Amino acid sequence: MLKFRRKEEKAALSVQTRPEESFRLAGGAPSGPGERRLYRALRESVPIIDAAIGKLRRLLGEFTVSCPQAQAQRELEEFLQSVPVNAMEHGVQAFLGVYFEQLLTYGNAVGEMVLGGGQVAALYNASLDGIELEPKGPLEAAVSVWEGDRKRPCPYPELLLLSALAPEAGSIRGTSLLRGLPFVSEILLKIYKTLGVNWDRLGNVRFAVTCKPDPSGLYAGDRARQMAEEWRRAMHSREVSDFVAVGDVSIKAIGADNQILDSEVPVRQMLEQIVAKLGVPPFLLGLSWSSTERMSSQQADMLTSELDAYRGLLTPVIQKICRTWLALAGYDPQCRVEWEQITMQDEVDHANARYLNARARQLELKEEET
């Protein structure tokens, strides 16, 4: 008889930066949760902010890692493409995408290399709402996990990945890319809300019905009630209905004499402030401003320098992941991260060159036909 061996279940991976749900209380929150909620609300309420961060994530590009040993490089490339990330994704690019968005939105990002079987078995993006960053001397930072109303230091800090965006001198807290935008965004949302209210009123017109009674004033109340009932019947009727009244009656649309304020100028002023802070060219966000076409190449160059700076923040994170995996696999931990070239300026030039070539070809065909 054939004997079937029971398949061994994989051991659960322990993530040290994730607090136990049973011990997690609402009161145990790290410093700055209100600020993080504000930045999340900004991304949810102002689509252009969320779109800009998504554009930066996609424009960041991909990278390759080179190692001295060919076998080590092949295995490392396979690991980077297939490593489990959080609960639903695979590949180091997925981990870096969440890590980068967290860094831009909150100013800090925390990740973890999860060990299993003596190897880096998974990568995990830690939520900043469940941890607290504390300085550990002038050159180090410590991470603690909130469990209820107490903090538990992470026992293996060498497996953690930490980054800060433009921290102030002597501080481990980074600066969010959205810092300074709440005030501007509040004004923009007020304008949009007012526009919605005004258009709702224009689409659902309210009327003022005025009836001047006889000088004697006899039966004025009865006539007013009867007129109100007839007007209500005429307005609520599903079919075309007439309103018949006797006497001096005037009907006016409420607000017909008012003029809706022009919102184009203030909305553009607020959007200019937001775009300037985010560093993304307006034409990438669907804003067709007159200066965009003339300055697209210069703006592409500026975005390239921004992306290079962001890559500089992520390169040490990638190197730490790769070196840890190589060391645990028994290989030389030396490796080098090489990003693909950001040539947005060249892409613009190439697009113009293709257009000119197509135009020249079209003219040549016309000359041949004649």
What is each stretch, according to the model?
Residues 135-163, 222-304, 308, 312-341, ...:
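Long amphipathic alpha-helical segments
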Residues 1-247, 254, 273, 357, ...:
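Structured, contiguous alpha/beta core segments that scaffold functional sites
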